[in-house]
Every structure is written in structure tokens, then in C-alpha cells.
From Swiss-Prot:
HAMAP family: Ribosomal_bL25. It comes from Synechocystis sp. (strain ATCC 27184 / PCC 6803 / Kazusa). NCBIfam families: PRK05943.1 (NF004612). Pfam families: Ribosomal_L25p. Keywords: Ribonucleoprotein, Ribosomal protein, RNA-binding, rRNA-binding. This is one of the proteins that binds to the 5S RNA in the ribosome where it forms part of the central protuberance. The keyword RNA-binding applies. Gene3D superfamilies: Ribosomal Protein L25, Chain P (2.40.240.10). Part of the 50S ribosomal subunit; part of the 5S rRNA/L5/L18/L25 subcomplex. Contacts the 5S rRNA. Binds to the 5S rRNA independently of L5 and L18. It comes from the Bacteria. GO terms for biological process: translation. This is Large ribosomal subunit protein bL25.
Length: 98
């Protein structure tokens, strides 16, 4: 089963708490262009559904960023959650070589 997720570029100067209240999760994509990173947002429900079938640092995911015309394979590098509420706070993706 191939996993894929569509991300949007995160607007600048927007508080991550405000994004979470709107049902979006802040995310970051590393490794797609050397040391450069991109700040992204992902739909909360889509992220939760995807994370049910993902193993961190192992499962390849097709990441699509339509705004930047970028598409590639990545793995979930890190998942940040609230310690006892288990609310999703942040995702980090690491892009592999094409």
C-alpha cells in the first residue's frame, strides 16, 4: 500500500497554536534541497490517518507540495505530541534522494 500526503506551504508569521485550532498541523521537510528546509502545514485528520500505518524513520511516504511544484519520497523523521493528552503538535519529514 503506497502512502501519500499533500502538504501546503506554511504562511509566514502564523502562530502554530492558531494553525492547530484551525485543524492544521505544522510540519517541516528536510533534505529535499541540501541543508534547506521548508515549513509546511498538514491537515490534522489526514496526518492521524497516515500515522496509523507508518513506522518512524522507516516507511516511505509520497509527499506532495502543489504550491512549490515539489513531489518526492520521504520518511517521517519525528513526531511531536503532547505528553499525556497525545495531541499531535508537529511532524518532521526527511526527503530521500530521487
Amino acid at each position: 500500500m503506497a502512502l501519500s500526503i499533500e502538504c501546503q506551504q506554511r504562511p509566514e508569521k502564523v502562530n502554530p497554536r492558531a494553525l492547530r485550532r484551525e485543524g492544521l498541523i505544522p510540519a517541516t521537510l528536510y533534505g529535499h534541497n541540501g541543508a534547506e528546509s521548508i515549513s509546511l502545514v498538514v491537515d490534522h485528520k489526514t496526518a492521524i490517518t497516515m500515522l496509523r500505518s507508518v513506522t518512524v524513520k522507516e516507511t516511505p511516504i509520497e509527499v506532495k507540495i502543489p504550491h512549490l511544484s515539489w513531489e518526492g519520497e520521504a520518511v517521517v523523521q519525528e513526531i511531536q505530541c503532547h505528553p499525556w493528552r497525545r495531541n499531535l503538535y508537529h511532524l518532521a519529514f526527511f526527503a530521500g534522494k530521487k
